[in-house]
């Protein structure tokens, strides 16, 4: 039983959870269009509604339920303060996904996945430190005076190279709590690395995918921009709600601590006044 099944069995329903996707919106976005029937993966059979003109049609009722389950789990991860890494290196998804990840302050990979990005994170972290050091150097007022034109050019090239490969995870100081991938086939290496480290994987699975390769599958068209953006918008809204809840909890804790500190101070002041008053009585006896 996968993590998704556990959440389904628990029947997670959060009053602050985003609403379920609308069937009509998914139809309009073309989320239901799968691949040619000859390219299908038999393991997707439970998510296929029918065949039409040689193309498999995805059961959108299943999409809605799976998306809700995945979104509820992602919301809880965000609420706990942990990081969710978005992975989308496909041309039609990379720009939109990177924009959404930036809005959420979540790490993302939209260029080539570097082998060992998760399983050899200690090495990746060294590269991130180098990137940070180069950025700090370039921001110094004496940068042009301290380095020759040739040195600055070399450092600029190094920085650009690192920025392109690792810019999306530049603030990541530890392995993420979860991955969200747009196409499990296209991001196979990322999925494999996550599985080795027992990191739960969420993602879009088309009719040519193996839904069992990840923990929270969302049956959907992973090739169309409108389909990808619709699913990304939905899970992003859930993550944003989780972050909002986290900030609310932190604020409630802050207010509670201030109240307790104020009450403690008032109590100590009252005790001190009582002690002073008692001492005065002793003196006057």
State what each model feature region is.
Residues 14-251:
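Ribosome large-subunit tunnel/peptidyl-transferase-proximal elements
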Residues 1-7, 179:
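Short, small-residue-biased leader/transition segments that mark boundaries at the very start
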Residues 5-24, 241-285:
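Intrinsically disordered, compositionally biased charged tails
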């Amino acid at each position: 039983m996968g993590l998704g099944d556990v959440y389904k069995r628990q029947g997670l329903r959060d009053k602050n959870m985003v609403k379920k996707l609308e069937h009509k919106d998914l139809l309009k976005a073309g989320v239901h269009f799968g691949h040619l029937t000859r390219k299908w993966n038999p393991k997707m059979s439970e998510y296929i509604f029918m065949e039409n003109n040689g193309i498999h049609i995805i059961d959108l009722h299943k999409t809605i339920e799976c998306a809700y389950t995945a979104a509820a789990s992602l919301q809880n991860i965000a609420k706990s303060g942990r990081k969710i890494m978005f992975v989308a290196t496909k041309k039609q998804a990379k720009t939109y996904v990177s924009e959404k990840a930036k809005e959420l302050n979540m790490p993302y990979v939209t260029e080539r996945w570097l082998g060992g990005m998760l399983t050899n994170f200690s090495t990746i972290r060294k590269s991130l430190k180098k990137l940070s050091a180069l950025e700090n150097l370039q921001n110094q007022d004496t940068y042009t005076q301290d380095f020759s034109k040739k040195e600055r050019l070399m450092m600029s090239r190094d920085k650009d190279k690192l920025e392109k490969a690792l810019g999306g995870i530049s603030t990541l100081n530890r392995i993420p709590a979860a991955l969200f991938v747009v196409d499990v086939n296209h991001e196979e290496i990322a999925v494999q690395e996550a599985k080795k480290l027992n990191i739960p994987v969420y993602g879009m699975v088309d009719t040519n995918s193996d839904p069992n390769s990840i923990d929270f599958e969302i049956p959907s068209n992973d090739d169309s921009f409108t389909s990808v953006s619709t699913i990304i918008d939905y899970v992003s809204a859930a993550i944003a709600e989780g972050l909002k809840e986290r900030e609310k909890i932190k604020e409630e804790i802050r207010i509670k601590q201030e109240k307790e500190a104020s009450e403690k101070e008032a109590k100590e002041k009252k005790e001190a006044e009582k002690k002073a008053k008692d001492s005065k009585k002793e003196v006057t006896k």
